Amino acid sequence: MRDLCNTDKPLFAVLTKLTYSAYLNILWLVCSLPIVTIGASTTALFYVTLKMAEDRDDGLTRMFFKAFRENFKPATKLWLILLAVGSFLAADGFVLRRMWSENIFWTLLTAVLIGAAVLYGIVLLYTFPLLARFENTTFGILKTAFLVGVRYLFCTLLMAAIYGIMGYVIVFVFTPAFLLGMGLCAMLCSFLMLRILYLIGGDPDAVHEEHDHDKN
């Protein structure tokens, strides 16, 4: 029993991460309820999970709402852009499915739409984690998300698989898994992305902290 409660044991560490994932998922769900705030809440979620991947987390709630507040405007702008593009692609897909016929024109149009949807998915995967980590313009974040997603394609596929498997489990296997949902997905993706984020820009948080210290 003493060994089971040892905080150095891998089992305890895993259970702790799962508990944190569930808590962060609740925060994310609550803060995403207005819909328009999904971008800010997702950015805040990744800010915390990336810190956790580095073992630099210090107060989940405080960190979450700090990131939510500081990134609200750029995250909301990015989210509204992505929501508009996603809605446009979904509407096109619906119309295409209803009007589709077996000829070269519709086949090519379907291929173009699928390609656009794949590119959209790549950008969507990386946009908010990048915003949680780096300061950039709206276009700069979207451009970097695309370039990183294409360059590190294996990581992109793994991240897409994580979300896909979680969605499948929730819908078809074990509905209560939604309690972990986005929190667990973000945590797993953060571990995958951490090395990539270092490669493309080092550790910007450490730079900001040093800069703030110098100003003081």
List PLM regions with ranges.
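Helix-coil boundary and N-terminal low-complexity module in membrane systems
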Residues: M1-L109, Y120-N216
